[in-house]
Amino acid sequence: MLISLVLTICAVASAQQVYVSTSGPLDPPSCTAIYVSSNILPSYHHSQFSYTQTETVRTAISAQPFPTETYGPPFSEMSHLLPALSTTSWGNWDPAATSTPTDEADPYGQAAYSALWQAASVRNFTRGIYSTTVAPTPVPKAELVVPPPLYFTPAGCYSFPCDFMLGIDSAAAQVEGAVADEGRTPAAPDFLVEFARSIGADTSDMEDDFIATENYYLYKQDIERLASVGIKYYSFNIAWSRILPFAVPGTPVNKQALAHYDDLINFAIEKGVRPVVTLTHFDTPAQFIGGNATGLSRRPLLGYLNLGYQNETFEDAFVHYGKIVMAHFANRVSIWITFNEPLTGVDTGPSVDHIIKSHARLYHFYMDELKGTGKVSIKMGAAPALPQVPSNASHIAATKHYNDLNIGTFLNPLALGQDFPDAYKQTIQDYVPLTQDDQAYLNHTLGVSYPTLALQRHFI
C-alpha cells in the first residue's frame, strides 16, 4: 500500500531543485505591502503540476581594507604628554618551575613579578597549548555559506541604517588566556571561580580564565575569520595588568604587551576590521582588591562584585594607564570605551566618584591634549526599566527609583552635568558630593550603550 501511494504522488507532481550562487547581504525589505483582510472563501481541486524550487546559496562578503585613516597624532609626537616611562619585559610564571628568579634586589624584576602570582594563590592553574602567535590561515569558501533566511519572519520591516556600527565584542578575561605569560599579573577575573566556590555557588558551568580561547596567541586567526564573514568592527579590551604588571604610576611599562596590542590593531585594520578599544572590562589588577580572591568576598553596596574601584589609588592609576594606551594607539583607534558596565563593580560611594572622574579625565585628555577626532564613552550595563503596568502608580515610582539609582547615577553628571539623583544619595550614605566645578567638568563626556530593557514593579 505504501509503495503504491508513493508512486501515485510521483505521478501527480514532479520537481526540480535549482541552486543559485550569490554573495553578500540580502536586500532590505521595501516595506510597501499593506495587509488587507479578505472574506473570500478558497476552493480546492486536484490536478497534475510541476514546479522548480530555487534556493539561493549565499556566501559572505569579506570585509575590505579601508583607506588609511588617522584619528590623532602618532605616539612619537604625543609621548611628551606622559611622565617619563621605563619599559621592560618579563617571562612567564609557572608554579611548577624548578628554578627561581635571582633578581630580588629589583623591585620590578622577575622575582617581584613571580611574587605577585605566588601571593595570588590561584588554584588549579593550567596553561594552554600555544606559546607564540599563530599565523592566520585562510577560511575555505565552503565555510562561508550563509544560513538560508527564515521562512517565518516578523511582519514589520526592520533593517539597520547604513551607518549602523554592527560588530563583535570580546573581553580579555573571556578570550585571551595566557594569564601568566609575558608579564601579565593577576587580575580580578582570575579569582572568580574560586570565589564562587567559596560562597557555595554552582560552578558547574564556570571555567577559569587561565586558558579561555587562547586569543592572546590566536588573535590573527580570530580576526581573519571575523573579516571573512564581513565583520567591520571588533571591540576588545586591553588588559591593564599586561600593560602595567605592577599597576600604578612609576612602575615599568611592559613593552611586550604594547607590541602585542599594536600588532593586533594593525592586523585588524589590514583586514578591514575597525578596532574598538575598551580600557577595562572587569579585569582590574589584583593589587586593587588585596591581591587574591579574598577581596572579591567583600559585599558591594550597589554593584555585584568588588572590583577595587573604591581603592584610594585607583583613580590616578587608571588615568595613568589609560593615558599610556591612548597615546600609543589614538592615531589608529576611533572609538574608546573607558569602563564596561561600571555599575557591576561599584562597591561604595568612592567607587562611583573614582569611575566618573577618571572617565572624564581621560575624555578630556583625549579631546583636549591628544586632539583626538574619535569618540570616548562608557558601556552602560544597567538597562533602563519600564513599569510592568504603565497605569500603576507604584510601578511607575519603582521604575523611576530604579532608573535614577542604576542609570541616573552616571548619566546625571556625565551626560547632563547635573548632581546625583536623590535615589543615589539616599541609598549610598558615603557618596562623594559633586561641586559645581565637578559637574561642569563631567558634563557631556558620556555616550550610552544599552543591551536590553527591564520591567519594574517593586523598589530595589
Set out the residue ranges of the language-model regions:
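Chitinase-like catalytic core of GlcNAc-active glycosidases
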Residues: 202, 212-215, 240, 246, ...
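Glycine-rich anion/phosphate-binding loops
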Residues: 208-220, 251-263, 310-324
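Catalytic domains of carbohydrate-active enzymes, especially glycoside hydrolases
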Residues: 164, 217-239, 264, 274, ...
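Aromatic- and Gly/Pro-rich amphipathic surface segment
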Residues: 187-224
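Fungal secretory targeting signals
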Residues: 1-17
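Surface-exposed beta-strand-to-loop junctions
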Residues: 200-201, 235, 344-347
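Aromatic-lined carbohydrate-binding/catalytic grooves of carbohydrate-active enzymes
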Residues: 229-257, 273, 277-287
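Active-site region of glycoside hydrolase catalytic domains
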Residues: 16-163, 167-170, 174-196, 248, ...
